[in-house]
UniProtKB/Swiss-Prot annotation:
UniProt keyword Hydrolase present: no
PANTHER family for this protein: PHOTOSYNTHETIC NDH SUBUNIT OF SUBCOMPLEX B 1, CHLOROPLASTIC
Transit peptide per record: 1-44
Protein name (Swiss-Prot/TrEMBL): Photosynthetic NDH subunit of subcomplex B 1, chloroplastic
Sequence ranges of Basic and acidic residues compositional bias: 75-85
Main localization category: plastid
Disrupted-gene phenotype: Malfunction of the NDH complex.
Location of the protein in the cell: Plastid, Chloroplast thylakoid membrane
Region spans: Disordered: 66-90
Keywords: Chloroplast, Membrane, Plastid, Thylakoid, Transit peptide, Transport
Species whose genome carries this gene: Arabidopsis thaliana
Protein topology in the membrane: Peripheral membrane protein
InterPro entries referenced in this protein's UniProt entry, alphabetically: PNSB1 (IPR044983)
Amino acid sequence: MASSLPLLPKPISPFFKTPPFSTSKPLVFLNFQTRLTSRSSDVSVNLKKKNNPWLDPFDSGEDPDNEYGSLFADGKQDEDPRPPDNPDNPYGFLKFPKGYTVELASLPLKIRGDVRRCCCVISGGVYENLLFFPTIQLIKDRYPGVQVDILTTERGKQTYELNKNVRWANVYDPDDHWPEPAEYTDMIGLLKGRYYDMVLSTKLAGLGHAAFLFMTTARDRVSYIYPNVNSAGAGLMLSETFTAENTNLSELGYSMYTQMEDWLGRPFRSVPRTPLLPLRVSISRKVKEVVAAKYRNAGAVTGKFIVIHGIESDSKASMQSKGDADSLLSLEKWAKIIKGVRGFKPVFVIPHEKERENVEDFVGDDTSIVFITTPGQLAALINDSAGVIATNTAAIQLANARDKPCIGLFSSEEKGKLFVPYAEEKSNCVIIASKTGKLADIDIGTVKNAMQVFEGSLALV
């Protein structure tokens, strides 16, 4: 009997009755949201409030029945206490880091969501950074005592000499798809060492930019994301996302940051919704003095000249918007427009010295020309002027920020409503649009008739 038994070892039964992966059968993924819909109605309401679908699918949001104590639960955060000044010390007082008393700082940061340091990564040039000013003011109003830092392009950094709410502005191009490895890692280390509580980004994030924000180790990582497949995986590394309406956020005009502003100003417990203030800029005394010397050398007098901005040029200092490519007008058109100026001296702003000879050829040798490349000097020039005639450049926004009469020239009515939505509410702002959709075809006669808006400035002089 024993000799008839087989000598082969007994086969071991497999752990899985069916193979864990088979190419003959399609993969099946669990849809967590369909499973969660069978729960109670109050949970489904909380799920609808959840904006980021990439986060924990089992997280139903904040518990409405949770009771907080009186400590750090309601109201806005308080500004950090300032030590008394030492009159014998030329440096004032020793500034300790904000997280020095860690046992007190961590509690309000966790319970109330305080933001002591905020970094804003801004995509674009002067125009895009200028339109972000109301958002910065909203952050300062919502989080008293917060320190706001900016990360933007070289051209965009120049804008923040007009903003006193910004502590530091660093140069880093977020739109560069292939940054230098040394620059990339150095910037990550710089941001990580500042211990930000919140990082905001206006660049449309994919997985790469989301990873950059994630490595800053900020508590709240908030960013716009692509409206297409390029956003895949970005939400895993971000705590809050805003899906852009298109791939070019600048095409939305003045309200390009509406989604982020609504989220920042949202009501929270006993704190009501924080209102969004209009665009305002502040100009330093030194910049005013430098600009005053420039336009006086050009033959202009304070309050008796009109700023002409938006001549056709290939210079980056034209301060155009990325959402409006057709926003510069040829010198032939400008020469015809200024013939309708009465009682004021037109002052042409050139973004490069090579344009000076072209302006003199088309307009005349006795033309007042000022060479300006920074938004701070442009704002100072507009502040001392009687008004502005400009295409869709930063000059239009600066004129309205300083409450100066302006005439805006746009390629279409749609562009005018997008970039200057407040024109109908203001009596000293006139928008003139081309009927053909091209800025070059704008009606010169209509522009000349609109110059009546400067008559009030002439009466004040």
